[in-house]
Amino acid sequence: MGKTPSPGKWIKSLLGKKSSKSSLEKGGEKLRSAKKEELVVKVKDNNVSKLPTEPPVVSSQEVAATQTVVVPDVVIAEKQLSGDIEGDESSNVNLESGNDSEEVKLEEAATKVQAALRAQQAREESQNLKGITRVQAVIRGHLVRRQAVATYSCIWGIVKVQALVRGKKARSSETVAQLQKTNTETETSETLQGSTYSWMENPTKLSMIDKLLVSSPTTLPLKIQYSPEDPNSAKVWLGRWTQLQVWAPGPLVVKNLVPKSQTKKRSFQAVEAEKGKLKRGVRKPTGVSTTANSSTSRSTADNEKPKRTVRKASTLGKELSKIENDKSKQSSRKSTSAIKEGSSVEVKDEKPRISHKKASLSNGIGKATRKSAEKKKEIADAVQKELPIEEVSVSLVDAPEDEKMNLIPVTISKESDLDKDEKSLVLDKPEQDELRTAERDDKAEEELKTAERDDSAEEKIQEPDAQISSENGNVASENTKPSDRRASLPAKIENHHQDDGLTQSGRKIPSYMAPTASAKARIRGQGSPRIAQEKPEKNGTTRRHSLPPAANGKLSTMSPRAHRLLIASAKGSMNSDRSFSSSKDIGDKSTKAEWKR
């Protein structure tokens, strides 16, 4: 649009009126300056000397009309001239004020007209731009579509040309191949290749074959790619393949493979069988053996692999617990009162066990023979080693799962008793000599003690045996606590020892009751007469006791007959439920035999 003039000039140019700046404006400017400043009168030098010394008084316009002022003649003449000029200027000021108000109104009207015109122009321009953008979008869309169609048509033509060229090449290659067949190949090769390439004679029959031939560039046979002299050609390759005779079977290779696989399998099976035998032999629980050879072999096996034996024994304890579960539930309810009374006695005597064992053993050495004293010492050492196992079993049984955990420590203590007793039987002569010297030293120290303390110490030592027997007897009772179980039998055992005290205190072993060489393997059963102590409870059931650890040092209390009955009853209790009744009968017989004595 260019640079627009001011609205006043623009309207004046439209109306045709010119702005005239005459001398009135100049006079107005002088008038304005005169109002602000005082009038200055120019006087010649000659006249200045004649002026009076008194200063002239100049009156302003505000002075009243009644006042009289004395002024010289020259000053009055100048005032008259100035009055004429002021009158002319006042008339000019009135004209200019009227012109200014008209100009302001004209400017306001011009701005309004300009705003309306500019708004209209902006609307028209925006509409034009919208139309232009729409036209451009339409044109571009047409161009893009035309370009896409052109490219598509070009690609389609190229693909058609390629398909035609490939088809011609495929047809020409087929004809060349057929000509070379008839001229160069033998009859065998012709028949072979005729069967393989027969489907290519009429490719137009199948549309899929035609498409494959058109699409794939490498559909030519092997002969066209290589010359007949080339070793990769079809004829030479066929001759080499027939010379190798790949289709013929290799009998030697087959005969060699079969026996190798059989020998491998057989050797693997034999190794597995040997491993299974070894595992079975080691995992068998140690039972009571009648000969010394079997006891030594079991002790060595247990020393080599103790973990496996413990697992097997724990599984046996769990199987026995399932069988005895029903009977133990009935007996546990009725025997809780007696059990709690025995537990208070046990708690008091837990700490001084080890110290009293030494005292009782030294006293027994003075009363019995040297052989019995040696055996007492060995058995006492085994029991002292067993005590930490018992304490561990107490901590394990006090766990929340009482019914599951109480089976494991009993089986461990049972096997440790058997292993340690078997080791004690196989002692060498130098070890026996060392034990004898230690016993003599103990004799000198223990003779100073009184017989009363010895008797009380012996009674206290009998309690661990009773506790171990009660643990082995109450393996399957799941409803009672382990502390109550261990305290169930000591009261009965102490009463029985008081009745039978004469035989156990200081009497020497007769000749017919002395242990022979054949009975050394069974010396484990001589520690505590379990079957003599076994009495029927209130509900009529008998307690089943495990093998005794022989910790009380009493070797002269049982006869060989009662000893054999004890071993038989211990074997029967580990096998099946039928052993319960047999052990009960044997226990009754043994008690009668001891009361007769």
Swiss-Prot record:
Bias regions of kind Polar residues — which residues?
A: 467-480, 572-584
Regions of biased composition (Basic and acidic residues) lie at 319-329, 414-463, 481-500, 585-597
Q: Where is the IQ domain?
A: 106-134, 135-153, 157-183
Give its localization: Nucleus; Nucleus envelope; Cytoplasm, Cytoskeleton; Cell membrane
Cross-referenced PROSITE patterns, in alphabetical order?
IQ
InterPro entries given in the database record: DUF4005, IQ_motif_EF-hand-BS
Annotated region (Calmodulin-binding), positions in chain: 159-173
Question: Keyword set for this entry?
Answer: Calmodulin-binding, Cell membrane, Cytoplasm, Cytoskeleton, Membrane, Nucleus, Repeat
Region Disordered: start-end pairs: 1-31, 268-379, 407-597
This protein's record includes keyword Repeat: yes
Q: Name one GO cellular component term.
A: cytoskeleton
Q: Where is this motif: Nuclear localization signal 1?
A: 264-271
Nucleus found in the keyword field: yes
Q: Where is the composition biased (Low complexity)?
A: 289-300
The free-text function statement in the UniProt record for this protein reads: May be involved in cooperative interactions with calmodulins or calmodulin-like proteins. Recruits calmodulin proteins to microtubules, thus being a potential scaffold in cellular signaling and trafficking. May associate with nucleic acids and regulate gene expression at the transcriptional or post-transcriptional level.
Cited PANTHER family? IQ-DOMAIN 5-RELATED (PTHR32295), PROTEIN IQ-DOMAIN 29 (PTHR32295:SF221)
**Family of the protein in this entry:** Belongs to the IQD family.
The name on file for this protein is: Protein IQ-DOMAIN 29
Source organism of this protein record: Arabidopsis thaliana (Mouse-ear cress)
**Species lineage, top-down?**
Eukaryota, Viridiplantae, Streptophyta, Embryophyta, Tracheophyta
Q: Which gene encodes it?
A: IQD29
